[in-house]
Amino acid sequence: MAPFIPGELLPEPGEIELNAGRPVTSLHVANSGDRPVQVGSHFHFAEANAALQFDRTAARGQRLDIPAGTAIRFEPGDSRDVNLIPFAGDRRVIGFNGQINGPLDA
């Protein structure tokens, strides 16, 4: 057996579906600002940059449905549809823009 390499991933053969079975919310997002805005995979989307125009109430408690460690970049004037999925686990949101700083379901 070959030695393991630290950090090496050994996925099973075939397709891997990310976030399988999770409920998805689709929102239309537009960057009304004059600078690009990038939002990471695990950022609480409702607290994203104020230049992004979208339904923040619908985005509460959710993050982008994209692979971990990746991001979506919105160029000035850019608009697109994004898919969001709910945070799981303890559903506590701490930090980001400080709008929640506690449990989402309280």
Curated annotation (Swiss-Prot):
It catalyses: urea + 2 H2O + H(+) = hydrogencarbonate + 2 NH4(+). It holds the Pfam family Urease_beta. Pathway: Nitrogen metabolism; urea degradation; CO(2) and NH(3) from urea (urease route): step 1/1. Its EC number is 3.5.1.5. Optimum pH is 8.6. One of its GO terms (biological process) is urea catabolic process. The keyword Transferase does not apply. It is an enzyme of class 3 (hydrolase). The keyword Protein biosynthesis does not apply. Optimum temperature is 45 degrees Celsius. One of its GO terms (molecular function) is urease activity. It is found in: Cytoplasm. Keywords: Cytoplasm, Hydrolase. One of its GO terms (cellular component) is urease complex. Heterotrimer of UreA (gamma), UreB (beta) and UreC (alpha) subunits. Three heterotrimers associate to form the active enzyme. Belongs to the urease beta subunit family. This is Urease subunit beta. It comes from Synechococcus sp. (strain WH7805). The lineage of its organism: Bacteria, Bacillati, Cyanobacteriota, Cyanophyceae, Synechococcales.
